[in-house]
Amino acid sequence: MGNYVFLNICLYTEGTTDIRFLENIVQQTYERAAIQAYGEIDIELHVITINKTGLNFTQQVLKAAQKAKQEYGATIICVHSDADSSSIDNTLNTKFVPAQRCLLEQENDSCSKILVNLIPVHMTEAWILADKRLLKQQIGTTLSDTELNLNKDPESISNPKQAIENAIRIARQNIVKRRRRNLGIGELYAPLGQLINIDQLMDLKSYRQFWDNVINSLKQLNLMRAN
């Protein structure tokens, strides 16, 4: 029988709505990755919140990583930031590379040192569109992707949040008035995060990059073969 490892992992996101959608996805991703690891790994995810007033991105990450280490003893911290474009390269180079450098410069055990970047293309809502069937179930519509103007690659939609809000509006127009209710996108983040299929997310390049980062973080802890 292999070794048993209990692993605290922390998550820091740009906003509270991002937490509602991403928390379960990060948990599921690590649990799936852990299947490939040596022995048995029990994952517990903790959401980190800080007062970020006046702090730049690197300072926010450092403060979150210090809290992650002090409160949970976490070596790994996942940090979310939207790409705000069709490529994650700029966000990676201008935000995450300096932040990782800063963490590595800190004294040992003063903060989480393994930074796992989570960078959706354009914005988090692009990941919601990875499973359009689930989205339509939650909206309560049988309209087609084309009728809802969602018949595109999620990562090619420059404003996925607006696209989802537009789809909700179109769907509501096709519901009998007495059965309508004012559904807002804010109500969808938590249930979609709980129900979305990781296999669907694998169709997105930005999620696959997050998956690779997760695998690499476990390798850095010598929990997986480094090959």
Residue ranges of model-derived segments:
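Short polar catalytic/cofactor-binding loops
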Residues: 15-17
